[in-house]
Amino acid sequence: MHHDLKHRIQAMRVKLEGRAPVAEIQGSSQLFVTPSPECRRLVELADVRETDRILEPSAGTGAILQAIRDAVPRAKCDAVELHAGLARHLQAHFPEVRIWCGDFLEYHPERRYTRIIMNPPFNRGDDIRHIRRALTLLEPGGILTGICLDGPRQQKALESLAD
């Protein structure tokens, strides 16, 4: 029995070593990688076009940025990422995207965006704070698509914002 467990662990180790990690992330409990189908759906709902100025305010590993790139390769994107290691990863893998490393709530771009696509942090109501902040950066007539919790607090806070 002990030998079998040791063998299975070794087999898993070999599989893991054969993969390149998306990024080395240390101690970030607020990082939730958005699965590809959800990313594609967010981009589809945003109706992204080449002429749009797009913001991804919690870029993480770049899953949403990749979906944007796949859908509209020439789209102009900016991204914000709090974690310095992830910001470096994003800059290396998305050189065409302007990356700002810092707290999105303190981000002050020169211009507003026509599209904002996001999966904000959910801890202690951060999703609502990030969505409200994102709306202040959206051009009139712009589109924001995002993921947030679906609890009573979120429903109440976002009810007046949805159309």
Label for each model-derived stretch:
Residues 1-163:
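Class I S-adenosyl-L-methionine-dependent methyltransferase catalytic core
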